[in-house]
Amino acid sequence: MSGVLNAVYVIAGRPGGLRKCLQYEIMSTVSAPQTIPVDEFIDRLRGLSEGVITKQAIYDFLVSYEVRPQDLERYKLWLPDRHTRNKIFRNEMLECMLICWPIGAITPLHTHNGQLGWMTMLEGKLLVENFRKIDCNRPENQQVVGMDCLAGATRIEMQQLGTELCVPGGPLNTVDKKQTIHRIKNLPEWNERAVSLHVYSRPIDSCVVFDLDAQRCFRRSAECSVPSAEK
């Protein structure tokens, strides 16, 4: 299927503030991906991890193949008040997980530890808000090996860059190595749960979280909610 779908969502701002109208242009994929069993999906991912991993290579894989829906049921864990990260596959080079988003779920504003990332929507929809860090009072903490930042700032200046609507059949959301910072929301007014599939290279064990109200940032664990169900 090909074509363009224009969708307009009006999102209420803070009390007393202006209402913000966001227009999204959603490009559908040119052709439907091939549906394969989860074991084959994992085997193909494992094969990719043995070669040179590029942003385009994983992107091409995820638009070409999708996991058979019934195979994903055993990876789903739902909590009423927060999203869950459920591991499908992980080795030294790649990590694949299913994230379940209850109504109203929202992530904190966070980095990705300098790694590559890909997200494809399976059910529902998600709003991604992208940011850029302009300044902080601990710039020296970014000069470390093996992670994007030690965190610990008590003054942070951020700029919002844009907003993306992620839907099944739409373009993949990607994370690059240039310290992509974003937060993801399943808006309450949509009144539906959401499910997304994520791949990271390399696996992300921790990330920097930004609390703009308290003007601080800190590192926190990015471990999955439950162990892998793979055989």
Spans of model-derived segments:
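N-terminal leader/capping segments at the start of a protein or of a new domain
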Residues: 8-70
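A short hydrophobic beta-strand segment most commonly corresponding to one strand
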Residues: 118, 190-206
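Conserved short histidine dyad/triad with adjacent acidic residue
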Residues: 98-111, 177-178
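Glycine- and acidic-residue-biased ligand/ion/polar-headgroup-sensing regions
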Residues: 103, 114-134
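C-terminal edge-of-domain segments
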Residues: 207-231
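Short acidic-glycine-tyrosine-enriched beta hairpin
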Residues: 134-179
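Short beta-strand His + acidic residue motifs that chelate non-heme Fe in jelly-roll/DSBH
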Residues: 108-110, 128-129, 174, 181-188
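A short glycine-rich, His/Asp/Glu-containing loop-to-beta-strand
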Residues: 74-103
